[in-house]
Amino acid sequence: MYLKALEIQGFKSFPDKTVLNFGEDITAIVGPNGSGKSNVSDAIRWVMGEQSSKSLRGAKMEDVIFGGTEKRSQMGFAQVTLVLDNTEHIFPRMEESEVAVTRRYYRSGESEYYINKQSVRLRDVNELFMDTGMGREGYSIVGQGKIDEILSVKSADRREIFEEAAGISKFRHRKEETERKLLTTEDNLLRIGAVSYTHLRAH
């Protein structure tokens, strides 16, 4: 698996649709300060499901949308599409040789997510990448200062980092979700039991 292409439109410093094509070999994005290199990595993190505006170097999520300049009007939405090679079926749920993930965000706060042009939920995007160790909580993309942060975190947090990188965090998430459902079911059964007991006493 490798990153084949990145399509950016209306995201931060990219008002026009911009397509970056990548090969299987090492790719370096170079340029002077302020040319948008960091915005490219932000775009990748964002389309993979990042929900923290702080992690994207902004105060609020709306800040990812191109804010306009003296010569250009602001955009009404931001959209990023990530195209990944899947010939080795790293994404076990996907049969296609390519997987394209799209995220669109409007100034109204509405979000849209797509996998191969099919409308999906954020949860579906998270689970897709969870199967690969590339999730938004993972460290396939490491920003400036992130190495020091990893080294200084508590052992429990470091364990989560390794679980995500190893691609096994999905099992922990699914276990936690199952446990929540069991607790909800137990609460419902207790309520039913209480209602039944009250009904029997009334008769």
Spans of features found by a protein language model:
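Gly/Lys-enriched N-terminal cap/neck module of very large, oligomeric protein machines
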Residues: 2-201
